[in-house]
Amino acid sequence: MPTSKKLKDALAKVDRSKSYTLNDGLELVRSSAYAKFTETVDVAVRLGVDPRHADQMVRGAVVLPNGLGKEVRVLVFAKGEKEKEARDAGADFVGADDLVAKIQEGWFEFDTAIATPDMMGVVGKIGKLLGPRGLMPNPKVGTVTFDVGRAVNESKSGKVEFRVEKAGIIHAPVGKVSFETDKLKENILALIDALVKSKPSAAKGTYIKKISVSSTMGPGVNLDVSDVSSQVI
């Protein structure tokens, strides 16, 4: 199969025993991408935390300086003036009970959801539908707010939410393989900076343990943690 040959060729380029500098690693990921579509570049960061303990949970959001290279469909639960503010900011869908009804019927044609605090009683009705899909508005990541205009702008500009998984790993998209290496680099450094600022006080020892980067279909490339960390402002 041609696809498997392309994957083998991509794997052959990567030395799994080596940790690459951020620049070299990104160049390798971009040159190893082989899919017919424009692949997303993803980062996986292993943190020195045990998320089974509430005081070691890492969660937050960061607006990537160069965006994600894709159109983000934003839904806002709001009424009155806040509804107008959301529409003026470019929200794709704005409403209240009408949107709740659509979602209850199985409609999920949006990428992120924002709600004003007074709407959370209504939104709570569909929490079990939104939560598993990572779409539930949350004040910790700035998606439950009265400043809906700013929240919409941030989401449209490439805001990425992150949350540590059971194994202590954070996964996040940082752009497309079509991005220039410097643009991807700036996005990754912004993510790492946000993770460092989100370090729980209960976390002991080495915090950033491992960083790897890959394209959607390509192999993972291990990055030199000290090289990446030294570039975080």
UniProtKB/Swiss-Prot annotation:
Keywords: Repressor, Ribonucleoprotein, Ribosomal protein, RNA-binding, rRNA-binding, Translation regulation, tRNA-binding. Signal peptide: none annotated. The keyword Repressor applies. PANTHER family: 54S RIBOSOMAL PROTEIN L1, MITOCHONDRIAL, LARGE RIBOSOMAL SUBUNIT PROTEIN UL1M. Part of the 50S ribosomal subunit. Belongs to the universal ribosomal protein uL1 family. This is Large ribosomal subunit protein uL1. It comes from Geotalea daltonii (strain DSM 22248 / JCM 15807 / FRC-32).
